[in-house]
């Protein structure tokens, strides 16, 4: 990726599409930026968290892992408002390696060796993060880094098209991630009713259960929705 104007046109075309804008941005990152996979996660100040889209199953697992654990490059990028670049997850001298113990274990199991997270923001408001991963260690070069920053800006435009965070609810129409949001949102509401807690507390309980069982958040949410799992008072 060495033609910034051409890259900008590709991203603009993705944002202009009538559906799956976020997924198209992820796919373009894989095609053009020399990475194995890409994903976009929603993390807002109102408490919305979820996987918007992912280019493949591994990317989806990495996104879900960070949402479930509340740690990882995506979370740090959103909190700091700055890119988090880890070109070698096996490098013990990288401070991030010690900062995300649970994420590191899951990423290693998934075969991820490098991760790069870019905050998706509009001004001072954070919407989430664009995450890129590689199956082999290696830093992004200057062109790739610049391209990723442009992709994060495009992701912000795509999410704004969906009115992300409006009303404190997950928006409809999040492309391939819509089923994820619908299931997690429904499960959160069911746990909220079962225990008489706030939406934020109910979502935290879902995350805690997924972490304790070593399962994806979506799997636990599906069990709740399909009534295979019910939260009781002792779970509070």
Residue map of PLM features:
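Intrinsically disordered, low-complexity terminal regulatory regions
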Residues: 1-69, 222-236
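Signal-transducing alpha-helical linker
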Residues: 6, 156-164, 179
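Regulatory sensory and allosteric helical modules in signal-transduction proteins
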Residues: 43, 59-98, 105-113
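Short hydrophobic beta-strand micro-motif common in sensory/regulatory domains
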Residues: 114-121
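Short beta-strand-to-loop transition segments that serve as allosteric relay/switch motifs
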Residues: 128-138, 143, 159
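Allosteric cytosolic regulatory segments
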Residues: 145-156
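Signal-transducing coiled-coil/dimerization helices and immediately adjacent hinge/linker segments
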Residues: 164-236
């Amino acid at each position: 990726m060495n033609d910034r104007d051409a890259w900008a046109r590709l991203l603009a075309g993705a944002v202009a599409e009538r559906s799956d804008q976020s997924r198209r941005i992820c796919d373009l990152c894989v095609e053009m930026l020399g990475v194995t996979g890409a994903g976009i996660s929603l993390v807002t100040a109102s408490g919305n968290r979820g996987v918007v889209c992912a280019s493949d199953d591994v990317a989806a697992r990495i996104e879900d892992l960070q949402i479930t654990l509340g740690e990882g490059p995506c979370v740090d990028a959103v909190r700091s408002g700055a890119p988090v670049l880890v070109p070698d997850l096996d490098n013990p001298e990288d401070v991030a390696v010690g900062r995300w113990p649970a994420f590191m274990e899951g990423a290693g199991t998934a075969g991820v060796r490098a991760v790069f997270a870019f905050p998706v923001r509009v001004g001072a408001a954070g919407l989430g993060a664009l995450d890129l991963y590689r199956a082999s260690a290696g830093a992004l070069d200057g062109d790739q880094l610049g391209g990723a920053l442009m992709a994060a800006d495009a992701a912000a435009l795509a999410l704004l098209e969906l009115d992300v965070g409006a009303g404190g609810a997950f928006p409809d129409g999040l492309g391939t991630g819509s089923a994820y949001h619908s299931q997690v949102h429904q499960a959160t509401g069911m746990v909220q009713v079962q225990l008489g807690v706030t939406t934020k507390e109910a979502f935290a309980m879902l995350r805690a259960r997924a972490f304790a069982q070593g399962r994806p958040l979506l799997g636990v949410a599906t069990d709740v929705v399909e009534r295979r799992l019910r939260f009781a008072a002792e779970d509070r």
